[in-house]
UniProtKB/Swiss-Prot annotation:
Belongs to the DNA mismatch repair MutS family. This is DNA mismatch repair protein MutS. This protein is involved in the repair of mismatches in DNA. It is possible that it carries out the mismatch recognition step. This protein has a weak ATPase activity. The gene is mutS. The keyword DNA repair applies. GO terms for cellular component: cytosol. PANTHER family: DNA MISMATCH REPAIR PROTEIN MSH1, MITOCHONDRIAL, DNA MISMATCH REPAIR PROTEIN MUTS FAMILY MEMBER. GO terms for molecular function: ATP binding; ATP-dependent DNA damage sensor activity; damaged DNA binding; mismatched DNA binding. It holds the Pfam family MutS_V.
Length: 872
């Protein structure tokens, strides 16, 4: 340390206190980074890495960014999961002898971003904490930008992971007793996990609760937020307690597979249920909509209350259109209030707040013309006329962005300010007169009087006009020489400059003081403004439901008392939107207490997965309180939805497709109740044919015998279709397809009964696989079918094993061994026959040479008849 300069000693001391952050160290007009921070920041920000003391033996790596444009660089780092500690100069270097005092004034983390450009308007930016005292777990989460703060508790890690998935925080704060295994699972949702080993001694204002663990979780969270932000956060609301069991439960897999808020392929909003339903007009409404999608209701009373309002908006489409116009003028009240409390609000933000609250009386008057018994929110809307008057009387309509450059307040708002502004204005009038006088006196028509912050006011004469010009004759004193001009000052101009700049400086200083006072006055309205924002966001969501209902021809769902699900002409809302409405084929679905399992067969690409997804999505929409894409819809209220759809390796945790499949199935089989909905799409395809078939059948039987959950189960194991003989609760349905002139035509219509062909080769043909591959596949398929003989389901194999005539060779085998032995022998024989070298008959040669992929069904029957006649 002896060779390190005092300034670098100061840097190293501060850095030692913020080891987990990149330190932005203020030096003049730049934020500098050194050592490993500089290497890391230069790589992520793609800026030049230089060296301090480059001529010394061990130069220090460094990089920097201008302070006036630092926000964009900070946003980039935070979006990449870094924390940034902002270290400012706490003294004016011009007025300080020796080292300037520096302090970290704020730590920007992924979960505490407050700047307008650093957060998505339509997304919450949550930070979450939890504490454990087995078996109890308490969880608290907050959006610092809006002030929302909630807390809950439960008794199992599965609910913890579900809640973290639902909340989708950008940062998680934990104490140091959390297992590494649990940390890895949390890392699947968020990259930023902060371990907070000890709490500060300060106790923050939290609603008192009898539940000690919830109090601790909230304290842990607020302590961390105050530690990083280091300023007033009075806009953070009192913690609101909620219970996870008050909402439909969907785990990470269900939300991903159903593409509720993020598409699987594009990882974006487009193509999701959120994308379809978002006809909101305010950022608050858009965030509320996402919350409602993530947490469908399970209270019939609450659902019906929302539906009643959607009814009202649907019936009054003219009023709804007017409401949308009013809402379009409302800015993000929640985040504007947050910035007021936080201290980074500017005058333009307050003008946005003024425009927003000026629409509240319009909205209230409009809703008063509708059914007030239904629209309970109308009584909670509060025109904030007193705040509106304050903002109207104080700020100009188009103030500058900076609050330290003046020009914020209207004339007449403050007498002292008016005097300063008048003096400045008169001075500038005098300057204009002086410029005209000097042009006449010198005869130089291009002479001008200008100003900059470095040199103040000056007279500028271009070099072309300086020939034969003697400055001293006119009392001009040279102030600055440029390549194409000279700048001068006179005693008279200097005297007036002091008066003008003195008035301007005093005006700017006074305006800033007045703005701080105005900000503190607005802060008093925080709670009332937050309540109005909540009401407006709910109205925005509900008018959005009515808008999409009218636009896409949706209907109001009803809820059955006997747990029946009956959808008439149902459609997948997202698929329907990206297609032509008239091209979409609607389908029915009926599940009740007697028949609660659909076994769905049909070709690949026929629409089995879409059909199952649409049942789940319609259920979610209904429990959000929205209309649904059906002609008629009667639904039970589901407590949970489980899905197993599509193939997805989990590379991060090293799980194979089949392992992921089994984990998703395990959750459904373990936690589903008779009030749950299960979507199983082709279970078992990630393993061998017979393992997969056995597992699929066992799962169907388990659901039928235990949970009785409503279940949609698609499969290509056609052996399973015989299960309806043993399971009265199971019904076979299929997605229809036809062959016409050798081409496969998907009808996308779900019909009763099973099909025994998946048309895999025809689908491959549609995908334009090489003709040689298609032809060879046809031959191999024919050989398999000929050698395999009569197909048997596993249930049939069980029955064979119980027959007294069973082959003695297998008499001592278990059911599983018998099944495996029979199946493997059949399979091996089928494979072996493909390579037999016995002399082929003429008929076999004819069959072998047939180009089946290019034959129509009629042509194939004619050829078959010819071959049959040859054998007679």
């Amino acid at each position: 340390m002896s060779n390190v300069t005092p300034m670098m000693q100061q840097y190293l001391k501060i850095k030692s206190e913020y080891q987990d952050c990149l330190l932005f160290f203020r030096l003049g007009d730049f934020y500098e980074m050194f050592y490993e921070d500089a290497k890391e920041a230069s790589r992520v920000l793609e800026i030049t890495l230089t060296k301090r003391d480059a001529k010394k033996e061990n130069p220090i790596p460094m990089c920097g960014v201008p302070y006036h444009s630092a926000d964009s660089y900070i946003d980039t780092l935070v979006n990449n999961g870094y924390k940034v500690a902002i270290c400012e100069q706490m003294e004016d270097p011009k007025q300080t002898k020796g080292m300037v005092r520096r302090e970290v004034v704020r730590i920007v983390t992924p979960g505490t971003v407050m700047e307008q450009g650093g957060v998505d308007d339509k997304q919450n930016n949550y930070i979450l904490s939890f504490v454990m005292n087995q078996p109890e777990i308490a969880l608290s989460y907050c959006d610092v930008s809006t002030g929302e703060l909630k807390v809950t508790h439960f008794n199992d890690e599965a609910t913890l992971l579900n809640e973290i998935t639902t909340i989708n925080p950008n940062e998680v704060v934990i104490n140091d007793n959390i297992s590494d295994h649990l940390k890895r699972q949390i890392n699947m949702v968020t990259e930023t996990i902060t371990v907070r080993e000890t709490l500060s001694s300060e106790i923050y204002s939290v609603n008192q609760t009898e539940h000690k663990l919830m109090y601790q979780a909230t304290q842990l969270l607020l302590d961390y937020i105050h530690h990083t932000q280091k300023r007033d956060l009075s806009h953070i609301e009192d913690a609101v307690q909620y219970a996870a069991i008050d909402y439909m439960k969907m785990d990470f897999y269900a939300k991903r597979n159903l593409e509720l808020t993020e598409s699987i392929r594009l990882k974006s909003k487009k193509g999701t249920l959120l994308w379809l339903m978002d006809e909101t007009k305010t950022p608050m409404g858009a965030r509320r909509l996402k919350q409602w999608i993530d947490r469908p209701l399970i209270s019939k009373e609450q659902i019906e209350a929302r539906l009643d309002i959607v009814d009202e908006f649907s019936a009054h489409f003219i009023e709804r259109d007017t409401l949308r116009t009013y809402l379009n003028q409302v800015y993000d009240i929640e985040r504007l209030v947050g910035r007021v409390s936080y201290g980074n609000v500017n005058a333009r933000d307050l003008i946005q707040l003024k425009h927003s609250i000026s629409e509240i009386p319009n909205i209230k008057a409009l809703l008063n013309s509708m059914n007030q018994d239904t629209l309970v929110q109308v009584n909670q809307l509060e025109p904030l006329d007193d705040l509106l008057d304050i903002l109207e009387q104080s700020l100009v309509e188009e103030p500058p962005i900076s609050v330290k450059d003046g020009g914020l307040f209207k004339v007449g708002f403050n007498m002292q300010l008016d005097e300063y502004l008048e003096a400045s204005k008169n001075g500038k009038t005098w300057l204009a007169e002086l410029q005209a006088k000097e042009r006449q006196r010198t005869g130089i028509k291009s002479l001008k009087i200008s100003f900059n912050k470095v040199f103040g006011y000056f007279i500028e004469i271009t070099r072309a006009n300086l020939q034969n010009f003697e400055p001293s004759e006119f009392g001009y004193m040279r102030k600055q020489t440029l390549s194409n001009a000279e700048r001068f000052i006179t005693d008279e101009l200097k005297e007036k400059e002091d008066i003008i700049l003195g008035a301007e400086d005093k005006a700017i200083e006074l305006e800033y003081q007045l703005f701080v006072q105005l900000r503190e006055e607005v802060k008093k309205y925080t709670e009332r403004l937050q309540h109005q924002a909540k009401i407006i966001s709910e109205l925005d969501c509900l008018q959005s439901f009515a808008e999409i209902a009218q636009k896409y021809n949706y209907t109001r769902p009803s809820f059955s008392e006997n747990k029946t699900l009956e959808l008439v002409e149902s459609r997948h809302p997202v698929v329907e939107r990206v297609m032509d409405y008239n091209d979409y084929v609607p389908n029915n679905c009926r599940l009740d207490n007697e028949t609660f399992i659909y076994l769905i067969t049909g070709p690949n690409m026929s629409g089995k997965s879409t059909y199952m997804r649409q049942v789940a999505i319609i259920s979610i929409m209904a429990q959000m309180g929205a209309y649904v894409p059906c002609k008629e819809a009667v639904l039970p209220i589901f407590d949970q939805i489980f899905t197993r759809i599509g193939a997805a390796d989990d590379l991060v945790s090293g799980k194979s497709t089949f392992m992921v499949e089994m984990l998703e199935a395990q959750k459904a089989l373990t936690y589903a109740t008779e009030d749950s909905l299960i979507i199983f799409d082709e279970i078992g395809r990630g393993t061998s044919t017979y393992d997969g078939l056995a597992l699929a059948q066992a799962m169907i039987e388990y659901v039928a015998e235990t949970s009785h959950a409503k279940t949609l189960f698609s499969t290509h194991y056609h052996e399973l279709t015989t299960l309806d003989q043993a399971l009265p609760s199971l019904k076979n349905v299929h997605v229809a397809a036809n062959e016409y002139k050798g081409e496969l035509i998907f009808l996308h219509k779900v019909k009763d009964g099973a099909v025994d062909d998946s048309y895999g080769i025809q689908v491959a043909k549609l995908a334009d696989l090489p003709e040689k591959v298609i032809s060879r596949a046809q031959v191999i398929l024919s050989e398999f079918e000929a050698s395999a003989g009569k197909k048997s389901s596993i249930s049939n194999l069980k029955m064979v094993e119980n027959e007294p005539e069973i082959n003695q060779e297998n008499s001592n085998l278990s059911v599983e061994e018998t099944t495996d032995t029979l199946s493997q022998k059949d399979f091996e024989q089928a494979s072996f026959d493909l390579f037999e070298n016995d002399q082929e008959s003429e008929i076999e040669l004819q069959i072998k040479n047939l180009n089946l992929s290019n034959m129509t069904p009629i042509e194939a029957l004619v050829k078959l008849s010819e071959l049959q006649n040859q054998l007679k």
